[in-house]
């Protein structure tokens, strides 16, 4: 049986942020994740937006953490080597009702402490970005864009480098209390762990873990949203996220958002689902994204579409009124040595570190652990080959000839970079894991050229048979066997 001072359940963006905060202290900490890598759930299935905090109820945990997370992110991105651009955001409108709602949420944002928001006319929209839709808009300068996969990976790798242990493929099946030893016994499909503290960061499964810890199985509702990914050709025409006016409840419909790597995301829409992992996309919703996205982004063309995907936000709600509730972060003596986080959805990426600090502070207040004097907040990241100058590329190839072998032609990812990703600090290795660390397979051909080459490199580096290589999740085996021998 493996024993720890604290176990975090879930390695999404919040769980990884909690792990990093724990590594600031002299604690034996671990993270249990049911999948084979970090960011395998909705931490990788979102817009990658750094939210400003103008649609959340004043005084709510969402509002406090969104504003706090937004204000600190330049420094966080620098420490972790995470791509980030403070682009600002346009919240555009077409009707008088749109204007009323925008002004309503502008006032809420100001009450929450969001700085610099202002109303602009169509001429100024065109000066900011001529391809943005709208007759008028609210300009929000503090918003930004980031890569949520890279951010989650950065948090987790920094935590790992500072001493936190990550256990992957460990789906939690039960948690019991051993009062005699003053510990929790956490059982997974594969192992048993013993820990004094448990922090629940299980995302869409947080309600089930909550119940295992003795808290309520809080009602949650799934809101699914579908997306288009547009080619980098489209990215040349959009420099700022363009959102429609929020609805009466503060929700947004389809928007157009440039990514830090030059693509454009169009979506999400929103509809209720009961399936926690229903990531299928549908023609009906894709057609709706094209229609609504064209209002936000004037250069919307089907020829730019290279991929689609879906994400699901599991929101805590009141079953009697249907009201969507605030993030829940709780800890009490009736459930000793636990911190319970439930209903963490958008803006979870923006709020991850502020939530983590609050969660870890509850443990620190009780335990008074010594600080980790060797904690290093900086994660060293190599510059991507395609971002290097010609002189830098030649120097890199001279030092390591594998930089001269391009594996992914669309994104110019080299063999040296693929091998670095395979040898990552977390020790994880799937095709999607390589994709999220390098952008290989994310280009126009979506892996048509490089995916089999990456698979072969994984086989060789990890000493796996082809049938053992997985695409992303636990059962996502790519190959089932040989068709024939090639001579």
Question: Which functions belong to the PLM regions below?
Answer:
Residues 4-31:
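N-terminal Rossmann-like FAD-binding beta1-loop-alpha1 element of flavoenzymes
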């Amino acid at each position: 049986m493996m024993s720890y001072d604290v176990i975090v359940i879930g390695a999404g963006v919040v769980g990884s942020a909690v792990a990093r905060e724990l590594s600031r202290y002299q604690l034996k900490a671990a993270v249990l994740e049911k999948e084979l890598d970090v960011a395998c759930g909705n931490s990788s299935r979102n817009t990658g937006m750094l939210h400003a905090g103008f649609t959340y109820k004043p005084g709510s945990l969402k509002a406090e953490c969104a504003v706090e997370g937004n204000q600190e992110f330049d420094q966080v991105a620098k420490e972790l080597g995470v791509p980030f651009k403070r682009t600002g955001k346009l919240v555009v409108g077409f009707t008088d009702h749109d204007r009323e709602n925008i002004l309503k949420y502008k006032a809420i944002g100001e009450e929450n402490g969001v700085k610099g928001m202002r109303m602009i006319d169509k001429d100024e929209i065109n000066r900011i970005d001529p391809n943005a839709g709208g007759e008028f808009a609210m300009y929000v300068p503090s918003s930004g864009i980031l890569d949520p996969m890279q951010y989650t990976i950065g948090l987790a790798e920094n935590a790992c480098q500072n001493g936190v242990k990550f256990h992957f493929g460990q789906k939690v099946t039960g948690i019991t209390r051993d009062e005699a030893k003053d510990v929790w016994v956490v059982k997974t499909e594969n192992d048993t762990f013993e820990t004094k503290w448990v922090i629940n960061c299980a995302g869409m499964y947080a309600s089930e873990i909550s119940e295992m810890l003795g808290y309520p199985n809080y009602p949650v509702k799934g809101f699914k949203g579908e997306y288009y990914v547009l080619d980098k050709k489209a990215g040349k025409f959009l420099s700022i996220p363009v959102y429609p006016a929020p609805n009466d409840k503060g929700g947004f419909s389809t928007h157009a958002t440039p990514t830090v790597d030059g693509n454009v995301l169009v979506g999400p829409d929103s509809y209720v689902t009961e399936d926690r992992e229903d990531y299928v996309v549908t023609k009906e919703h894709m057609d709706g994204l094209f229609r609504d996205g064209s209002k936000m982004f004037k250069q919307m063309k089907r020829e730019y579409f290279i991929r689609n995907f879906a994400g699901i936000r599991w929101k805590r709600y009141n079953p009697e009124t249907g009201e969507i509730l605030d993030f829940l972060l709780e800890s009490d003596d009736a459930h000793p040595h636990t911190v319970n986080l439930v209903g963490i959805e958008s803006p979870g990426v923006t709020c991850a570190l502020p939530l983590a600090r609050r969660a870890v502070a509850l443990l620190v207040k009780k335990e008074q652990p010594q600080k980790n004097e060797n904690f290093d907040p900086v994660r060293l990241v190599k510059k991507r080959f395609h971002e290097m100058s010609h002189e830098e590329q030649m120097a890199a190839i001279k030092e390591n000839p594998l930089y001269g072998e391009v594996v992914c032609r669309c994104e110019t990812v080299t063999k040296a970079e693929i091998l670095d990703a395979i040898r990552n600090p977390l020790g994880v290795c799937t095709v999607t894991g390589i994709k999220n660390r390098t952008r290989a397979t994310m280009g126009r051909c979506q892996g048509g050229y490089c995916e089999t080459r990456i698979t072969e490199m994984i086989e060789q580096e990890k000493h796996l048979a082809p049938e053992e290589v997985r695409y992303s999740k636990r059962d996502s085996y790519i190959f089932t066997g040989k068709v024939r021998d090639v001579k």
